[in-house]
Structure formats: structure tokens, C-alpha cells
Amino acid sequence: MRSTYKTIGLWVILIVLFVAFYNFFSQGNDQVQEPSFTQLLTKVEEKKVQEVAVKGNTYSGKFTDTSEKFRTTGPAPDAAMLNQLRSNGVDVKYEREEQNSLWLTILGQWMPVVFLFLFFIFFMRQLQGGSGKAMTFGKSKAKLLSESHNKVTFADVAGADECKEELEEIVAFLKDPKKFTKLGGRIPKGVLMMGSPGTGKTLLARAVAGEAGVPFFSISGSDFVEMFVGVGASRVRDLFEQGKKNAPCIIFIDEIDAVGRHRGAGLGGGHDEREQTLNQLLVEMDGFESNDGVILIAATNRPDVLDPALQRPGRFDRRIVVPRPDVKGRLGVLKVHTRRVPLAPEVDLEVIARGTPGMTGADLENLVNESALMAARQNKERVDLSDFEAAKDKVFMGPERRSMIMTEKEKKNTAVHEAGHALLAKLLPGCDPLHKVTIIPRGQALGVTWSLPTEDKVNGYKKQMLDQISMAMGGRIAEELMFNEMSSGAANDIERATETARAMVCRWGMSEKMGPLAFGKSDGEVFLGRDFNSSKDYSEDTARQIDAEVRNIVVGCYERGKNLLTENIEALRRVSDALVEYETLDAEDVNILLQGGQLTRERPPPRVNAPPKATEKKDKRKILDALEGLPAMEPKKA
């Protein structure tokens, strides 16, 4: 409230000063002549003076011919002068002479300076967020989190048990340090959490803040860098000064790769503001001055670009990898996020956990949220299994685009393409089990064939790779067999098949001709601090052999898939016809069709393309009529 009154008062003062400033400088803007006293008397004799106001020795008035004002000084008026003025028809007025106040004179002279000074102070206060300090660019932007602010505990974290144990030990050290120091141990100075986006690194840090019971400072890595040189290093110093004053405490830096990338490499030059900030951070973490009681926790999903000096023991003593959750972890995450969601009795979270391999904690939270939104959209009291299935389809494959207009030819081609993928997924043993196939456009795809593994996979095997390449080419093969034509819809399939084959040859040593060798190195992104001058470690002849081997693998898988689909051409036709009729088939539907059965479930409502409007038909007819009357264009002569 006091801040509001101060702001209102400051605005009132500024407005008053502005009005006074304007009035002061607006005085005398009218055109006023200053003739000599002799010239004034001549004008009087010529009867060109309308009126004269006498104020001491000052004569002011207005001319008759030009209506312009004048002001001049002369001797004190006497009787002869007054008679001369009256005889020439001049209206004479007397005005009392006033003494100017000294304070008014000083105010008029110093008012512009005071106004500019107050305006500058007001501008700086607004620029600095009203902190009242002249310059606060070098101050840390770390936020001190209170215990009651969105409190998260380790009970809210699931799917990362080993990471929780490491961080719980940090919390235990802060609560009872003697338990560890009596045996000569010391508290870790820093903890670096690494993992894919969405695995729960920031959530773990929030859990530490809720459990530690000590001051917790939170800041982002990008908050250190500004356009002013030296600001980042100053903010690092200020951050650790705050930490020392509040020790024991925890400092959390999110996305530390924004400030902790490799030094002295990349296209950005050898020395810049980020490197200066990083150098100061290295000194503060482990320099001559000790930071006892200040624990630094950082999170990043790009550990490969961090500077080696930042990751050494003494700065980050512990490096915790936060992985994607397995089946058990996904079940725990689902239980955490469904605590406030009413579930139908048939919903089995363990089944959902098994059907969502590769999903992170953030993905699962989004899945639960989408399921709840879909149930609410249909006015349901509880979230049932169909809502989870629909949400899973939306998260994995993208939202449906039922309004997209497709011709019958495009629809049939898409059905044949997806039927080729689905049929090879059922026939090849190395492919993941088929889950669903649809020709409803989703995301950027016209159709989707979705396979789900039955368990989490750690390694890939050669036979599986070859089967996956054959399945990826199944869409192109089916188009060739059914229509004797090729479309551009297989572009992404061909790209994935080629990438897999090249990785088999160059990275995994799965080529019999090239042997168990690795060819080439990953150059990395030069802007991320990687080496700019990197070269191939093999000859041009070897490169030609690699290209030939990649081609042999892809073409061999193509021919294998073509033979399988040729042998099962009737099954391919049944699946494609069912896709045209039903638009979406699950694994059970495909099994029925492969066994020669017929589907008996209800058909979806047809998607009818909207007919053109009458006005559109008239406009098109006018254009065609106009074109018929034009002469044919002749080719230009060279």
C-alpha cells in the first residue's frame, strides 16, 4: 500500500512539474516587436498605434496597421508626451510596476534541471523494477523458495529410485552432518543430474527443496548471461555470497548447459561473456575460498557439451543419470498422477504401464491429463480405459484430422500403404507386435501403423534391424504390387530404412563385408563447442564400399518384404479393403482378416467431402467462359 501511495505521489509531482515547465517555456511565444523609442513616436505621429500601456519606463501596446504587439523602454512619461499620445488617438493605460520575487526567479531558472533529474530517477527506478538501487544488473536473480510454496516431497517422485536415494543422502547430511563427519566424510559440493527431457530432474530438485529444511535458491543458467560485459560473473559472485550468508543451503541451477559449455571452441570465438561467467563459476565452486555448507545442484539434458573442468570431482562430486522409467517406474508415476483422478474399476494401471514403453514421467503426466480431459468432454463421472486408449493414440500419433479432405484414390493408396506395413509387422518375427493401424490423418502423416514392444528393450539385434527395415519398406512394396505405381508417401520410410542400414554398417559393425569396424566420427555441432576441423577416418574407396553395402542391405530387405507380400497378396487386399471401410484396425482385427474371417463391428460414420458452393460454381464458370474467348498463347521466339 505504501508503495502505491509513493507511486501516485511521484506521478502527481511529475505532472505538476511538467505543467509548470510547459507554462514557463510557453510564455512569450507570441510575436512581439521591440522598436526604439524614436520609432515608436514616429508610429504615433503616423497614427499607427492603437493603444499604449505604461509601466514605469516600459511602453507596450499594439500597432493599428499590423495588429502586432510591441514593447520598448524610454523616459518616464510627462504631460507633453501624454498630450501627444492622446492627440493622435492612442488609448493610454497605466499599469502598476511590480517587483519580481527572488524565489520565483530561482524556481524559473532551476525548474528544468530539477524536472530532468526527477525524470531520470523515476526512469531508473522503473527500469530496475522499483528496487531503489541505481544499478542492479550485477545482482543475482536467484529465487529463495519458501517451505510452503508448492511444496513437493520425495513421495511425489516415482520411477527414479536410485536418484532419490542419492539426493536423500544429501538431505540427511544437511539435517544430521555429525553422522557423516565423525568418520571423516565431507558433504558433496555439487550434484549434477543428467537425463532426457521430461525424466524428472527439476521435480527431484523441487523435492530436495521440500525435504531439506534449509534455504533453497533456484536460478536458470540463462539468467547469468546479459548483454553487458561482466554481468554474468558478477551475478555468480553475488549468488555464492548469498549462499554463504545463508549456509547451510542449496543452490539449484537449471539448464546449466546455457552457461557451462566448452570453452575455447566453436564458431563463436575463444573468449566471450559466457566463458567469463563459467570461469567465475568454476572459481566459486572450488577455488581458494571454501564454500562449506553450500551445495550446488545442477540439471542438464546435454551433458556432452559441458566443460570438463565443470564436471570434475571437487565441483560436481556426484553425477546422477535420471533415466526413462521402466515398467515398474511407469506404474509408480501413473499412481502418483492418478491420485486425484477418479478411475473406473476396469482401469488397470499396470496394463497401461506395460503399453507405454519409452514414455518419460512428463509424457505419462500428459497422458493422464489428456485422459481426464477426454472423459470430462464426454460428461463422464470417471475416467475409463477407452479414455486412456484415446489419449495414448493422441500422444503417440498426434490428434486426428478428420476434417482433412481426401479423394477416394488417395484414401485407397493410403490404405494399401498402411496395410503393407501392418502385414509385414505380423509376418516378420523381429518386428514389435502390431498395436493399431489407421488411415485417419494424424499429425503430419496421412496414416499410421503403430507397433508396441511387449517389454523394455536395452539392446538391438541384427535380425530385428533387418526385419524393421523390411517393415519400413512395406508401404512402398504394397503400392508397387497393388497399383504398379510409386508415391511420395514412402519418403520418411525410406529415410529411416537407410539410416538404420548405415548405422548397422558404420556404427554397430553388423556388416559381414565391412567387418566389425566403426567408420566416421560424429562431428557434433560446432556452435556447441565441438571441434570444427573434423575429417573422415576412411578412404574414398572405403566410402564407396560402405555405400554399396548400405544399398545391398536395403535392397535385400526390400526384396524379402516383396516376396512375403506377394505370397500373401489376398491378405493384403483384405486388410486394405477393411481399412477403407473401417479406417482403424487393431491387432485383433488384423488377425481375424489374416485367418480369412470377416469383421462384424460397427462402421464409423462416413466422411463426406463438402460440395462446392453455388457461388464457387458460378465463379468457376465465369473464369472458364472468359478463357474460351482468349487466343492461344504462341511460344516466344528465341
From Swiss-Prot:
This is ATP-dependent zinc metalloprotease FtsH. ATP binds at residues 195-202. It comes from Myxococcus xanthus (strain DK1622). Homohexamer. Its cofactor is Zn(2+). CDD domains: RecA-like_FtsH. The lineage of its organism: Bacteria, Pseudomonadati, Myxococcota, Myxococcia, Myxococcales. In the central section; belongs to the AAA ATPase family. In the C-terminal section; belongs to the peptidase M41 family. Binds 1 zinc ion per subunit. Residues 596-638 are annotated as: Disordered. It is found in: Cell inner membrane.
